[in-house]
Amino acid sequence: MSARLEGLDSALRRRWAARVRRLAPWIIPFIASALIAGCASGPREADPSAGLIERMASADVVLLGELHDQPGHHRVRAQWLEALAERRSITIVMEQLDQRRQPQLDAERARLVESETLSARARRVAQAAGFDFEGWNWSFYRPVVELAIDRAIPLRAGNLSREEAMAIARGQAHRLSVKVPSGWGPLQESLLRASITEGHCGLLPDSMIVPMVSAQRARDAQIAEVALSAQASGRLPVVLAGNAHVRRDYGIPLHLSAAAPDLKVLAVGLLEQGQPGNPQAYDAVWSVPPIKRPDPCEALRARFAPRPAGSVGMPAR
């Protein structure tokens, strides 16, 4: 009986061996492909921003700076926003939107238009919130608005209205009831003046710098107020603004600390590699390769150049 079983077992092994030989041309590539796929789906190269994202996720308020014309900054911020939205309930606060038009923003966002694309809807919402399509590059900010709509993320307008900005330019900042933060002093005043002077190539007269200092301080106070409102609702506010606004020494963090000293604020400056600046002004810095851009001072030099005798009107803008 045992011999018969052994003979049967031997016959079965020979039969299966023959089948394997016939199928080998198909089986071996399949196994190889599976092994390769397994390697490809294994651990990827570590994301260099992963640690920074975790720091953002543990904060009470996140401030992300930018150079307005740097596409690399906008790309990485959009990636961070998506990653943060996976970890926390966030609210996006944008410097580019008019805070007084928040009701219009909300109304347009809630209004559905048949067959409207996400891109068209995002543009309609931004327009309702006072986005300046001539002053800002919409292609940089569209992905943020689209993300907010697509993922049902609250979107808050953070900036002063045009009317408020004009009031400040006329020296009427007192009409806005903007409080000077407790940490504001001569050092902060001089740093902000120096930043504005340098940003305008040293061409601005003092008569223009003074209201611009007041305007930026008012903008920072306004954005801080919006961020605090979002944070009080239990969400993580993520503020998108220029680097000067997110600086710890004279920007939004100063206003946040004055209003809520225990708030955990993370200010991230987005710079270009080799860019002169003060990395210590931020809690973290992210640098990207620089882009080529025309001399920004040329237009200002033309604007403030002495006019020929007998000419009338303002220099061309």
Annotate each PLM feature.
Residues Q231, H245-R317:
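C-terminal regions of proteins
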Residues L67-Q70, L97-R101, S161-A165, N243-R247, ...:
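Solvent-exposed loop/turn segments at secondary-structure junctions
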